[in-house]
């Protein structure tokens, strides 16, 4: 299946841009039959997007969703024009997700759903290739407070349902257009339990139910971001291995 390798601004600074690009170029050589995209997540400004475009990324996201609507259009259009001139595709965002992811920090009070009546104008004026919308997902492993959730018979938190009415209205206004959901990790409870069992402390970590993600994927959603799930799986597995094999110190063994 095609593969999108997504890099945030923070990950790019941590791992080094050149190393990342060359690793992906090596993956393309080693796996010639798999289409691979190197994508910038939540590019905060034109300069960051331009640096990634010039440096070998094949896809970028410009996130000006915190700006007023007209300014979001202006910034996004500038990135789109430069990216398209260089054969790079652009994801944009309307609406603001709550939660924390690297430099992206949005409180519940600052978050807001996407307004469907804005999407057609935004896409037409910017020329973006895909659009991230806000329908109730949230960044991080702590997507919802206990007050926002109910509890099932096991006492586990059950998050509020996504706003599929908003998604449906967006799809009506943008038929066939690629839609993106950020903050959509399901936060598998087996990994949360694994982290907690082996020395971690992640009470009430809860994600988006997978059946809701499958429903979104059957609609126009073509990209679902699940970074927290990858972190949980890796962290839980490493914690478990180190607890069960305290004599081991070679990272190649875990």
Regions found by a protein language model. Name each.
Residues 181-186:
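Short catalytic/ligand-gating loop segments at beta-alpha or beta-beta junctions
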Residues 197, 208-254:
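C-terminal alpha-helical cap/extension of soluble enzyme domains
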Residues 7-13, 251-254:
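Short secondary-structure junction/hinge motifs that connect adjacent elements
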Residues 1-11, 18-34, 42-178, 189-194, ...:
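Alpha/beta enzyme core
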């Amino acid at each position: 299946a095609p593969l999108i390798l997504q890099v945030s601004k923070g990950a790019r600074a941590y791992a080094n841009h050149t190393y990342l690009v060359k690793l992906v170029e090596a993956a393309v050589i080693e796996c010639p039959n798999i289409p691979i995209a190197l994508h910038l997540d939540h590019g905060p400004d034109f300069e960051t997007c331009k640096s990634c475009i010039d440096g070998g990324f094949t896809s970028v996201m410009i996130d000006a969703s915190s700006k007023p609507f007209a300014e979001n259009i202006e910034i996004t259009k500038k990135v789109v024009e430069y990216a398209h001139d260089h054969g790079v595709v652009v994801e944009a965002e309307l609406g603001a997700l709550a939660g924390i992811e690297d430099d992206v920090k949005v409180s519940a009070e600052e978050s807001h759903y996407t307004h469907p009546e804005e999407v057609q104008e935004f896409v037409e004026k910017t020329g973006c290739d895909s659009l991230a919308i806000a329908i109730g997902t949230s960044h991080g492993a702590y997507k919802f407070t206990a007050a926002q959730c109910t509890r099932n018979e096991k006492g586990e938190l059950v998050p509020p349902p996504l706003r599929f009415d908003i998604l449906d209205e967006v799809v009506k206004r943008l038929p066939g257009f690629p839609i993106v959901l950020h903050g959509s990790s399901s936060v598998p409870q087996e990994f949360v339990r694994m982290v907690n069992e082996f020395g971690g402390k992640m009470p009430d970590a809860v994600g988006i139910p997978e059946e809701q993600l499958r429903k979104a994927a059957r609609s126009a959603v073509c990209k679902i971001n699940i970074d927290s799930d990858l972190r949980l799986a890796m962290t839980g597995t490493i914690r478990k291995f180190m607890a069960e094999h305290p004599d081991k110190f070679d990272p190649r063994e875990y």
